[in-house]
């Protein structure tokens, strides 16, 4: 599976698990990347950071 396909599948799983629109997930990921706020204190973002770091 390509990296783009993996990212798409992951965004889909996150949107279903947390009942968030997939475009909202992408927008929030973009906001997180541009922000200095520590989102790792929120469970949703801990999961995102774990996946991005290869821990999940």
Where are these regions (language model features)?
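Short, charge-rich amphipathic interface segments used for partner binding and complex assembly
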Residues: 24-56
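N-terminal acidic leader/helix
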Residues: 1-22
């Amino acid at each position: 599976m390509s990296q783009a396909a993996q990212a798409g599948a992951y965004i889909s799983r996150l949107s279903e698990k947390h009942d968030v629109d997939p475009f909202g997930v992408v927008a929030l990921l973009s906001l997180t990347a541009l922000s200095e706020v520590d989102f790792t204190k929120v469970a949703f973002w801990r999961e995102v950071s774990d996946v991005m770091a290869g821990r999940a």
